[in-house]
Amino acid sequence: MTLCSSLWLNAQNFIHPGMLHTQADLDRTKAKVEAGEEPWASAYRKLLTSPHVSLDWKAAPVEKIVRGGRTIWEPDPDNYQLAYRDAATAYQCALVWHISGDKAYADKSVQILNAWAKTCKKVSGDTNACLAYGLYGYQFANAAELMRDYPGWDATDFGRFKEWMLKVWYHGVIGFLQGRNGTQDDHYWSNWGLCNVLCAMSIGILCDDVFIYNQATEYYKYMEDHRYGESLHHLVWKLHPDERGPFGYFGQMQESNRDQGHAAMALALAADLCGTGRNQGDDFYALKDDRIVCGFEYVNAYNSGVDDLPNSPYTNCDGTFMRMGDGGRGTNRPAQARIVNYYENIRGIEVPYSRKMLEMNENGIDAGGGFGGGNSGGYDHLGFSTLMCTLDPLEDKTKVPTVLSGKIAYEGREIDRPDVNCIPKGATVTLTALLPDGETDTGKWAWDDDPACTFSTRDIVLDTSRTFRVHYTNEKGVSNTQLFALHVEGEGWTGNFTPYYKMNGTTGTDTLIYVKKYDELTFGMEYIDTLSLIHISEPT
């Protein structure tokens, strides 16, 4: 084994833009639209008919977003529609700017984002507020990610927006993921966790915070010991051998026996989650032997008319759901082109049921907010996957990327994953990119930050939190990327924590305290929850 060691050159962090879309996606779409190629040209014309692509749109920010109002937890009525409409407008205007170059749409997007960051202080409601955190948080973050390099967005305003995402949104989503409102692990259906993971992950990217990114993706990748619905192992909770499915399996999804409206929502959120990860070099699609595509095809097979699918009763803490839920059958959420183009045009894997669902859209073109009705379901996803995710067909199905994985080692510990939080500052860390069993190593490795390193394994001295990416080119000349996301202990956003002590009847916030022998002392941290204005005290 050959190692290359370095501190590193040209430190970098997350790819920007790098959530639902990369710069390559934006450049490709712009070129295809300008050339009049289909389906991009028609998909763009559809975008332009959206009620949200309007320079006359007036932002309607509120100090308090309410979802689950008129309850004992929140007396005021719901107003969350204002958030999802403005988020959709900011996102769609950002797309139009990138494709057309018309700065008026960029200014409109920035105007909306600034208005919300300056005005909104909290999210409130009953437990349904947790859906607002996840859904509208990831949507605002994605709109901002598309606008972050716009010269017309003042750096101070962008900084304020990022702080808003951290203070108003991050604590809400991570609070839900960690606490589940005091319920059992499997009480919440997968959509609740998926949208909150997607939001936290997006905030980590937007704010270049490795800790938050890793903290979020942990729930999707590794939480097998819990029965969280968003964890991949439980999201696609059972594999049924069936030659019609990808790799010879259909994957029964956690929401399949509930109803198809929610199963389709989970499919689209998972697709956006996978797409976001892959855009950072973190290929969520390929995890656990491409388990997620077995779920995609299962949901899409049933919703495209297949009746004889294998199915098992699903049991959670609230009961047993004996058979496929047929409510909302035929629901089609705007993410099918993302699924089809990754699997068919990158990986060379046929997904006939996902393609059929894509083609069931008018002219095979999906849309987004403003096209699926005025209620919240029509705004659960930013959409426009046909426009933004369509690729040229893969002519040679053998020219596909090699699936990579990674592991790290430091201070005598070896961890079979490429993303770790709380590594000691200054530790020497060994990064190793791994090929699948039986794959011949071409030796064609390239690290983004250190062109001199051309091996699959390297040592780095980790002085600050950051990401590393290695690219591998296989025998077919096709490249793939593996992300390593490493967080240094003590770094990252600290939130609204204040240290305190109590001694001899006095309370203070100093961290250097002089005490006498046998004095009674209580010290700890106080967390001010800006979402509900609750004070949580954690004495030690």
Label the predicted regions.
Residues A11-N181, L194, L198, K221, ...:
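Extracellular glycan-targeting catalytic surfaces
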Residues N480-V488:
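C-terminal edge beta-strand
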Residues M1-Q12:
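Bacterial Sec-dependent N-terminal signal peptides
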Residues D437-W445, L533:
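Solvent-exposed loop segments of extracellular immunoglobulin-like
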Residues L531-T540:
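Residue-level detector of conserved catalytic or cofactor/ligand-binding positions
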Residues S456-F468:
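Solvent-exposed segments in extracellular or luminal domains encompassing
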Residues G426-P436, E520-Y527:
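A short beta-strand segment in extracellular, disulfide-stabilized domains
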